[in-house]
Regions:
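Alpha-helical transmembrane segments and their cytosolic interface
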Residues: 1-19, 108, 139, 152-194
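Hydrophobic transmembrane alpha-helices
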Residues: 1-61
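Helix-boundary and loop/linker segments of multi-pass membrane transporters
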Residues: 7-8, 36-38, 76-81, 110-112, ...
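Hydrophobic alpha-helical transmembrane segments
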Residues: 12-17, 45, 59-64, 88-93, ...
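Alpha-helical transmembrane segments of multipass membrane proteins
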Residues: 22, 26, 62, 66, ...
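Interfacial aromatic-anchored transmembrane helix boundaries in multi-pass membrane proteins
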Residues: 26-39, 65-100
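Internal alpha-helical transmembrane segments of multi-pass membrane proteins
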Residues: 108-131
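Juxtamembrane non-transmembrane "cap" segments at the membrane-aqueous interface
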Residues: 128-152
């Protein structure tokens, strides 16, 4: 039987490792481009793992770390140029809420079916992340988005979907869905060891 103190130490260690992984992926993920149009982001995978293994607050923490590290990347300069408060609020809120919601969904479904719980959490994370990003774009950056959309001759909605969401969301969603069985395996191995 694992003692309460040991279990807390293991969780803290796991959270520290996942925090480091999120930081590295958040920083270097922006340098991996898909056809020059979108940046690949793998940070939501350890966010889902942390949210499932350590709880919703750990997921929120990991999402917040991802957002905070983004501020150190070259991509952040564009958004800061539009609105510093808007960028800070949008980026931190989308990461924190993605991790929190993923953890809450996992916790809600875990007792019924762990496989469904992890896949659902892996879907919820990028949906919330992208949804909050779009809301932030409308609230804080709408004038700029309108100008960009007009220059392309398309609607604001089409511009948001094509240029700001586009392949990045599809990649994040598919990556999370495809790696869910791996995440589930990690969960099962950890459960057997406890």
């Amino acid at each position: 039987m694992v003692t309460s103190s040991r279990k807390k130490t293991e969780q803290l260690t796991l959270l520290a490792l996942l925090t480091a992984l999120v930081a590295v992926l958040a920083y270097f993920g922006g340098f991996i481009k898909i056809g020059g149009l979108a940046s690949i982001s793998l940070t939501l995978i350890p966010v889902v793992i942390g949210a499932a293994l350590c709880g919703p607050y750990a997921g929120a923490w990991l999402g917040g770390v991802s957002g905070a590290v983004f501020f150190l990347t070259a991509d952040a300069a564009f958004w800061f140029g539009l609105s510093i408060p808007g960028t800070v609020i949008t980026v931190l809120l989308k990461g924190i809420l993605a991790g929190l919601c993923g953890g809450l969904v996992y916790r809600l479904l875990e007792q019924k079916n762990r496989y469904v719980a992890v896949i659902t959490a892996a879907i919820v994370c990028p949906v919330v992340n992208t949804g909050i990003f779009l809301v932030g774009c409308v609230i804080f950056f709408l004038d700029t988005v309108r100008d960009f959309a007009a220059a392309e001759g398309i609607s604001v909605f089409a511009y948001l979907i094509l240029f700001f969401v586009g392949l990045n969301f599809v990649f994040e969603l598919l990556t999370n869905i495809l790696l869910s069985p791996t995440i589930l395996r990690v969960l099962n191995i950890r459960k057997k060891n406890n």
